């Protein structure tokens, strides 16, 4: 499980883009705060940041003709098996959304994709 550097979202092949959507759904739902070495940093921030990242993924999906469930466009939604947030303070989006998504992380993501035979 990993969140690709946001600069790569629009360049990701279909499988990685759709996989990213699934991972965001899992993290926003019952996966919230469950330890995983590659994504632990997201739990240091408001869940609203994950919503912002997920929104980038879903907007790219829509550009490509996919139809993510509209429920996920609600920042309070956490999936069918998890209670929605009652309240979640809206925060201004930063660039990058997560400070961990720096140049070093971008290169790490590119290397990971390259190992899968994907050159971006």
Enumerate the predicted regions with their spans.
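Expand to "…catalyze enediolate/carbanion chemistry for C-C bond making/breaking, isomerization
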Residues: 1-120
